[in-house]
Structures are given as C-alpha cells and as structure tokens.
Amino acid sequence: MSIPDDLRYTKDHEWIKLLEDGSAALVGITDFAQSELGDIVFVELKPAGTKLKAHEVFGTVEAVKTVADLFAPVAGEIMEVNGSLDAAEVVNQDPYGEGWLVKIRIDDPASLAELLDAAAYRELIGE
C-alpha cells in the first residue's frame, strides 16, 4: 500500500498536497481508499468556483461495489477539476498522480497541520 510521506491525510481517506505557491493544493483519494472501493467507474465533482468548508462533501466516487462521498480536507475554493477523470480508472491506476481530483485554493494553509501525517495515516488503516 502506497502512502507518500510528503502528503497529509484525512480519516475519510483523502490526501492533500500543498503546491509550491503555498496557497493551493491538490486533493485525491488514497491508495487504500481506491483499493477498498474496487474498480472506479465514475467520479462526480462540484465545479470550479465552488467554496468548501472543511469536511464538506465535494463529490462522489462510484465504484462497481459502492458509491462513496468525497470530503474536503480543508476549507477553500475549487480552482480546477481534473479533466482526466472522464476515464475514471485513472484514480485506481495512479491515485497520487494523474488520479488527483480537484485543485483548491486553501483558506488557511495552517489548517493542514490538523491533518494526519503519513505515519498517523498508516496507523489509522492498520499498516
């Protein structure tokens, strides 16, 4: 199970990666989440310009087995939705790379400190 050390994680199995400018970040689902969901067939996300509160639902992932809500790790505004998700299987194939979901402008970058680091996420999923 891949759990990169340079990301932050939520208890809902989303990851967030702060981008170089420090005010924007990419958000996706973890390798653990995509593995548990199985083959992802459709991703529905709120559009760019949507303002989000931390823990607010920003979309859904539909897999063969189930449908799961996606929760914003921090408050912010969706700047971009990943256009590659028309081929939803990219989330299974590369959850930390090409399978990212949204790019958000973060209201408070310090709020990332409240999220789990890689070691805490490993503990959460029992690795």
UniProtKB/Swiss-Prot annotation:
A Pfam family per the record: GCV_H
Swiss-Prot/TrEMBL keywords: Lipoyl
Cofactor note: Binds 1 lipoyl cofactor covalently.
Family assignment from sequence similarity: Belongs to the GcvH family.
Signal peptide: none
The protein's name: Glycine cleavage system H protein
Function per UniProt: The glycine cleavage system catalyzes the degradation of glycine. The H protein shuttles the methylamine group of glycine from the P protein to the T protein.
InterPro entries, per database record: 2-oxoA_DH_lipoyl-BS (IPR003016), Biotin_lipoyl (IPR000089), GCV_H (IPR002930), GCV_H/Fam206 (IPR033753), GCV_H_sub (IPR017453), Single_hybrid_motif (IPR011053)
PANTHER family found in the cross-reference section: GLYCINE CLEAVAGE SYSTEM H PROTEIN, GLYCINE CLEAVAGE SYSTEM H PROTEIN-RELATED
GO BP of this protein: glycine decarboxylation via glycine cleavage system
The keyword Iron-sulfur is annotated on this UniProt entry: no
Domain (Lipoyl-binding): residue spans on this chain: 24-105
Gene Ontology cellular component terms for the protein in this record: cytosol; glycine cleavage complex
Known cofactor(s): (R)-lipoate
PTM sites of type N6-lipoyllysine: 65
Organism listed in the record: Chlorobium limicola (strain DSM 245 / NBRC 103803 / 6330)
